Amino acid sequence: MSVYAVGLTGGIACGKSLLAQLFEALNTTVVDADIIARQVVEPGPVLNCIVARFGSKILRADGCLDRRFLRQRVFADVAERKALEAIVHPVIRSGLKQAAAAAAGPYVLVVIPLLAEAGGRIGYPWLQRILVVDAIPEVQHARLMQRDSIDAEQASLMIAAQIGRKERLAIADDIVFNDGDPVHLGGQVCNLDARYRALASVFSDVD
């Protein structure tokens, strides 16, 4: 793939969406796995496969996927979650690659929440660089409770369901620490944007 692609990931409530917005403000093209995931499960062949595996109870009255119902079902059962991932993840990966390849600009930022779970570049070998946004567990926990209006126990369960912080940081080429200071965060993003533009210019010359 000729475009210089940077993968962005991070734990839940660490600030992936905020970081993506800051990069967009610098005229960086952003491709988001969550958006593609929503498109993938619209009525069509992928949704038909999901219904065949999980039953029609996962559908709303209008025939669309009841995302909240399915999320609650697979969250409580690892085997069910893996079955769902086996259906949707290959399609999402393909969609991400296509969208990234079509992106304009010197580089593209690809937001992939489960990048570490996919093995980093093992799952996405076309990424040239991986950026992880990180926050200390206490801050992450508090943000999640506030964002989703949930109690401490629910927040802990949601965080525990993800890959560990250590494993996520291990795949990083670059790390942004989101400590809640917008000036500090913006400065980190500006520095990284300049670095990625420089790397992309060299990559374009030799690709």
Swiss-Prot record:
GO biological process assignments: coenzyme A biosynthetic process
Coarse class of the protein's main subcellular location: cytoplasm
Keywords: ATP-binding, Coenzyme A biosynthesis, Cytoplasm, Kinase, Nucleotide-binding, Transferase
Pfam families for the chain: CoaE
Positions with a binding annotation for ATP: 13-18
Signal peptide range: none
Keyword Ribosomal protein: no
Database matches in InterPro entries: Depp_CoAkinase, P-loop_NTPase
Gene Ontology CC terms, in alphabetical order: cytoplasm
Gene3D superfamilies named in the record: P-loop containing nucleotide triphosphate hydrolases
Domain DPCK: 5-203
A molecular function GO annotation: dephospho-CoA kinase activity
Protein's cellular compartments: Cytoplasm
Catalytic reaction list: 3'-dephospho-CoA + ATP = ADP + CoA + H(+)
Pathway(s) it belongs to: Cofactor biosynthesis; coenzyme A biosynthesis; CoA from (R)-pantothenate: step 5/5
Top-level division of the source organism's lineage: Bacteria
EC numbers on record: 2.7.1.24
Family named by the database record: Belongs to the CoaE family.
Known role: Catalyzes the phosphorylation of the 3'-hydroxyl group of dephosphocoenzyme A to form coenzyme A.
Name of protein: Dephospho-CoA kinase
Gene source species: Xylella fastidiosa (strain 9a5c)
Organism placement in taxonomy: Bacteria, Pseudomonadati, Pseudomonadota, Gammaproteobacteria, Lysobacterales
Gene name of the encoded protein: coaE
